[in-house]
Swiss-Prot record:
Signal peptide: none
Enzyme class: hydrolase
Pfam families for this protein: CLP_protease
The entry's keywords: Chloroplast, Hydrolase, Plastid, Protease, Serine protease
UniProt xrefs under InterPro entries: ClpP (IPR001907), ClpP/crotonase-like_dom_sf (IPR029045), ClpP/TepA (IPR023562), ClpP_His_AS (IPR033135), ClpP_Ser_AS (IPR018215)
Upper classification of the organism: Eukaryota, Viridiplantae, Streptophyta, Embryophyta, Tracheophyta
Gene: clpP
Organism encoding this protein: Spinacia oleracea (Spinach)
Catalytic residue list: 101, 126
Name of the protein this chain belongs to: ATP-dependent Clp protease proteolytic subunit
Length: 196
């Protein structure tokens, strides 16, 4: 029998009695955000809304984005990345488990010096892929052109954020490259490995 999302007590400032809220809402109030699924428009919009709201609420307190994601759609992932760059508070990114594909792109988008992975986390980078393999030739060519533009954008961002030359990043993105937390640190995707 599923238990659903656990509830925890939360007392708003100035209130005597605590109310029960789901654990994620409680953590959001502490500026702790979670990407624990495939990146799609729905989770992207939720995270963007939370980052903007929390930034407006208090632009001096940092945000913390915990990532355990197999990746997902490019455009919603880039939207999360762009929002992280746009909001005034620093966004710490923390990889727990897996940050693959767009998950690693969002991970590298955290404030430089504030990107972290747990010791046994895995990070994977690769080039963006197409979902339209059975499209007509004309549609396929248009999509291929768009994919090349997206790949160029992602390569530039990885290069800027990691300090690696573009040719190194481009070469790494040719195939799935899995890294340990230590390897991701050496690659410049994260800055610190959490101590066990």
């Amino acid at each position: 029998m599923p238990i659903g999302v656990p509830k925890v007590p939360f007392r708003s400032p100035g209130e005597e009695d605590a109310s029960w809220v789901d654990v994620y809402n409680r953590l959001y109030r502490e500026r702790l955000l979670f990407l624990g699924q495939e990146v799609d428009s729905e989770i992207s919009n939720q995270l963007i809304g939370l980052m903007v709201y929390l930034s407006i609420e208090d632009d001096t307190k940092d945000l913390y984005l915990f990532i355990n994601s197999p990746g997902g759609w490019v455009i919603p992932g880039v939207a999360i990345y762009d929002t992280m760059q746009f909001v005034r508070p620093d966004v710490h990114t923390i990889c727990m488990g897996l940050a693959a594909s767009m998950g690693s792109f969002i991970l590298v988008g955290g404030e430089i010096t504030k990107r972290l992975a747990f010791p046994h986390a895995r990070v994977m980078i690769h080039q963006p892929a197409s979902s339209f393999y059975e499209a007509q030739t004309g549609e396929f060519l248009l999509e291929a052109e768009e994919l090349l533009k997206l790949r160029e954008t992602l390569t530039k961002v990885y290069g800027q954020r990691t300090g690696k030359p573009l040719w190194v990043v481009s070469e790494d993105m040719e195939r799935d490259v899995f890294m340990s937390a230590t390897e991701a640190q050496a690659h410049g995707i994260i800055d610190l490995v959490a101590v066990e």
